[in-house]
Design a protein with these regions (language model features):
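SAM-dependent methyltransferases
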Residues: 1-9
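Broad gene-expression machinery/nucleic-acid interaction feature
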Residues: 11, 56, 69
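Generic structural detector for well-ordered beta-strands
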Residues: 13-15, 73
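Compact, glycine-rich, soluble single-domain proteins
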Residues: 15-65
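C-terminal structural segments of small proteins and small subunits
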Residues: 63-97
Length: 97
């Protein structure tokens, strides 16, 4: 359920730093990574909107511009590898620049 926090969830926050923000291609990259994990993964924008990280439409609906902070919430077993892969993706500025 989208409004229910995950039990024993691990969270981490990343900042969008590319000029164009999270448009279609970065959204697809986020979904591609999230889809490799079996557990639930949610993303929350600072304003409180929470979406499934495996949904490209959900990620795009966040309209995350440069400087937006996105908080990922996942199951503990997925946490170390998911955080590493997402951190690397965000650090690469989604290969936009």
């Amino acid at each position: 359920m989208p409004n229910q926090p995950l039990e024993n969830a691990h969270t981490f926050t990343l900042e969008v730093s590319n000029k164009m923000g999270v448009h279609a291609r970065p959204a697809a990259m986020i979904v591609r990574i999230a889809s490799h994990f079996s557990g639930e993964i949610w993303v929350t924008k600072k304003d409180g909107e929470r979406v499934n990280a495996k949904s490209i439409m959900g990620i795009m609906m966040l309209a995350a511009a440069r400087g937006s902070e996105l908080t990922f919430e996942c199951t503990p077993e997925d946490a170390p590898e998911l955080e590493k892969q997402m951190s690397d993706l965000f650090a690469s500025k989604f290969q936009d620049e």
